[in-house]
């Protein structure tokens, strides 16, 4: 099995949530804070890494990222509220099928 990948949410200064994937979300967040990587943070700087979930590989993380990006903001906020912090990152995708998220219609 390869290196795990992570889906993460970062809160921007304007209150919005940015979703991305990385094999090292803390390093990626530090890059976002420096204005590197995503153009998203040019207008509203990255403030906090608020949600992280681990996936077994990049492909699974990409599939989950697409699902999370399609969620309404209220559903993303629910993910953030359910997150116990960086010490509580547990592997997702133990089964062949990732959890089903309901995307906004």
Curated annotation (Swiss-Prot):
Transmembrane region(s): none
Disulfide bonds: none
Disordered: annotated span: 85-105
CDD domains: GIY-YIG_UPF0213 (cd10456)
SUPFAM superfamilies given in the database record: GIY-YIG endonuclease (SSF82771)
Domain GIY-YIG: 3-78
Family recorded in the similarity comment: Belongs to the UPF0213 family.
Protein name as annotated: UPF0213 protein PP_0972
């Amino acid at each position: 099995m390869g290196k795990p990948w992570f889906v993460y949410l970062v809160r921007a200064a304007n209150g919005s949530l940015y979703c991305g994937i990385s094999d090292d979300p803390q390093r990626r967040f530090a890059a976002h804070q420096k204005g590197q990587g995503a153009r998203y943070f040019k207008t509203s700087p990255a403030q906090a890494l608020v949600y992280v979930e681990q996936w077994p590989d990049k492909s699974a993380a990409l599939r989950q990222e697409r699902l999370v990006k399609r969620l309404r903001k209220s559903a993303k906020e629910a993910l953030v509220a359910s997150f116990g912090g960086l010490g509580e990152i547990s592997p997702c995708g133990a089964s062949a099928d990732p959890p089903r998220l309901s995307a906004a219609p």
